[in-house]
């Protein structure tokens, strides 16, 4: 299963140049479907917000600081874990066999198991999993579960006037499960 689930991330190509990379946030939110480009966390479950991350860090290539195609919509946690990490000191060489953050090949390196935990498939994925984003110590399964529960709750809410009493109970159970998972995410600082 893909880290981003059903969401297909695609960047807009004709984005006007801005004088501050933070001005790209509204467009990034749309292009990244309101989820983290690295871990797939939806905005609804974060306790710390989202921000643009420079895929190629500024210390490696300062000329790309305002380049929209170099920005990733990232949850606070992924952005802080990645920081200025880049596998090589060469801006044009994104992969020395240790890591590759490029989205086209992302799914070949990382994915999710049937429970929603992130897993790696390659040595590149292992580096991202254990070093770049520290998925090995983060509650990724819980994040996946809560996003699925929120989606189910939203679907039920859309037909709330037609729900049976049994379905209303399911709605309340979903709400309770979401609140319990939110507590876990807060405690884990996600």
Model-derived features: where do they sit?
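Histidine-centered catalytic micro-motifs used for acid/base chemistry in nuclease
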Residues: 52-58, 75
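Extended charged
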Residues: 1-9, 22-27, 43-45, 64-70, ...
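Conserved phosphate-binding loops in nucleotide/dinucleotide-binding enzymes
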Residues: 61
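Residues immediately within or flanking Cys/His clusters that coordinate Zn2+
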Residues: 33, 72
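An N-terminal structural lobe/cap that precedes and organizes the functional/catalytic core
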Residues: 15-19, 35, 40-46, 51
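Sequence/structural segment immediately N-terminal to covalent heme-attachment motifs in c-type
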Residues: 28-32
């Amino acid at each position: 299963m893909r880290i981003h689930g059903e969401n297909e991330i695609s960047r807009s190509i004709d984005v006007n140049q801005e004088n501050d990379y933070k001005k790209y946030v509204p467009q990034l939110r749309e292009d990244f479907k309101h989820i983290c480009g690295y871990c797939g966390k939806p905005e609804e479950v974060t306790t710390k917000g989202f921000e643009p991350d420079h895929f190629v860090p500024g210390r490696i290539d300062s000329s790309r600081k305002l380049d929209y195609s170099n920005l990733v919509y990232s949850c606070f946690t992924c952005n802080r874990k990645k920081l200025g990490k880049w596998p090589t000191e060469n801006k044009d060489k994104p992969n020395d066999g240790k890591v590759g953050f490029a989205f086209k090949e992302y799914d070949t390196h990382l994915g999710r198991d049937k429970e929603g935990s992130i897993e790696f498939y390659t040595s590149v994925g292992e580096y991202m999993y254990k070093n770049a984003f520290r998925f090995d110590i983060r509650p990724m399964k819980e994040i996946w579960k809560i996003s699925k529960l929120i989606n189910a709750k939203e679907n039920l809410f859309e037909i709330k006037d037609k729900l049976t009493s049994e379905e209303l109970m399911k709605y309340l159970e979903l709400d309770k499960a979401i609140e319990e998972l939110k507590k876990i995410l807060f405690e884990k600082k996600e």
